[in-house]
């Protein structure tokens, strides 16, 4: 038999309202349940059924499809758990009950209730199937599982894989049915529910439970159920009787973080004025929830954050801390607004107004569980949030009150499990009257007024006049002992009080909480880093940083040096071309001429050819000087400027007219040294204008005609060189300025990432 676990609330320990109590001595034994189920109910703390349990359990045991609506915290989980356990056939190892929940936390909580009530049932197997856990573990659990509880996504996956056999399922339960069946495009629950429902046997019983019953839920459930029976208590008044609801208007601002700061200040003031056991703070944004948890922890208030962005283990750990009273404040999104049962939570704060009235009712239902007393406070800005809050109050007929300022001390009617003493101090430091003897006196008086309580915790919350709230809590658990007789008489005289208060400074320091010095929280700065060391560290971070595996293809060492490294080979090659252009041209012209003509021309026109060659050499040199700077000019420039000039000249030469491109390609394939006798061989391969120029230079013509043709040729080539250089420069700068913003943004982003990583250390 499984160990019994307390799953019910103790009715005698706290005040209960009428919406969870029934008149008369009705007990669970009058509901005709099986003996193991009754034993499990008694062992887990269930003494008498609530009104919703009294009406719904008998109808469910008759096999009817039920739609159950009741207020938050009135025992709906116990309804379908009791019906499911009482209908099980333990000898059959197949899955007989399937329970779906909208969140993993609710599924885990349902599993705990089932195991607590079914603790007296020998051989009961109940398992949870949720995301974040290995599939192999789920397959192992499904070999013998009477009750399967899980989220729709994982259950659908197991059915598709064939691991979960649904042919023997006789009871299908939808907990928080309005959330599972809501018509929302952002939620895929409805599609998954339809798929799961279609795979189940036709002859089955179905239960749908929720604290809210919107109109859309009735339309959705009509598709699944056969003549369902409605079990609804106080449908026109969904609010809890023991819960006081307040709202507070905070100044609106155009910047969201300013509004958040205003709400946080009001929240800290509320925590310092209202004594509470545990509190739930709801935020619409994940980032704000985590930020608020950090702020409260820095103020000394134990706070834990839970959201959908955390891992499954972190989420379960946060819920365990809340239920085991390991944290005072839980900051959450709407992940825990439904179904979560924490008995000691008596304060709920909405940092943001919820999106709809259903979410609001579920949020405030986390306080005032099973008829207890509690307080709910909602912060809203002027304008849209205020109008939305008023619409919710009108829709649900809520008794919504404005939070008084200043907050009165008696706003929390129920006494807390630990006593909270609020003291106003003149200085932020710890006062002299903070003595252990006075705390013992306060404890003795409280134990005298409440002798039935075995243990309690004393918390001292101090508030400074200057507005800085500091909470110094000294939590001390006292064993069950009564003060000695005559003890209070000895403490009454003032002289004895002064004598007892004379405690050394060392003893007083020992009673205070041990907080590390401020220097231990600071990162010790080492020696100063030079720029070269910082550069090496930055490159190491880019290559070998956390989560990085970078292969360096090109290293940027500055604009001019980078251009030299990348294009250094091309620069040298182009310089060789410029210096050998004339030699290649002459050698190719000699190769193309016949031998006889070559000899005759060399004998008759040797002087003329030498003159024309000198003129063509001057022309080629002038052309090369227009695109390639002279050696003296390059020597005069700095090293970092030389590469830039060379690159610009290369770019200008690459855009020369098409008539010169084949010539350069041919020259690059030739050897640099050719015999001078082959100069005329290139004559037939030259373009038309070059042939004309060469022929006219060898003919005996007048000086005027030769001068005119030379001037026209030089003028034409100069114009072509000018426009080609102009286009080259324009294209270069267009491409450069087009990509420069992206290069700057990339560099800025990488530097910002590097700085952030350095700040962490």
UniProtKB/Swiss-Prot annotation:
GO terms for molecular function: ATP binding; ATP hydrolysis activity; DNA binding; RNA helicase activity. It comes from the Eukaryota. Residues 600-613, 623-635 have a biased composition (Low complexity). Residues 57-231 form the Helicase ATP-binding domain. One of its GO terms (biological process) is spliceosomal snRNP assembly. InterPro entries: DEAD/DEAH_box_helicase_dom, DEAD_box_RNA_helicase, Helicase_ATP-bd, Helicase_C-like, P-loop_NTPase, RNA-helicase_DEAD-box_CS, RNA_helicase_DEAD_Q_motif. Pfam families: DEAD (PF00270), Helicase_C (PF00271). Residues 498-512, 655-679 have a biased composition (Polar residues). Its main location: cytoplasm. Residues 683-707 have a biased composition (Basic residues). It catalyses: ATP + H2O = ADP + phosphate + H(+); a ribonucleoside 5'-triphosphate + H2O = a ribonucleoside 5'-diphosphate + phosphate + H(+). A motif (DEAD box) lies at residues 175-178. Residues 266-415 form the Helicase C-terminal domain. The SMN complex catalyzes the assembly of small nuclear ribonucleoproteins (snRNPs), the building blocks of the spliceosome, and thereby plays an important role in the splicing of cellular pre-mRNAs. Most spliceosomal snRNPs contain a common set of Sm proteins SNRPB, SNRPD1, SNRPD2, SNRPD3, SNRPE, SNRPF and SNRPG that assemble in a heptameric protein ring on the Sm site of the small nuclear RNA to form the core snRNP (Sm core). Part of the core SMN complex. Belongs to the DEAD box helicase family. DDX20 subfamily. This is Probable ATP-dependent RNA helicase DDX20.
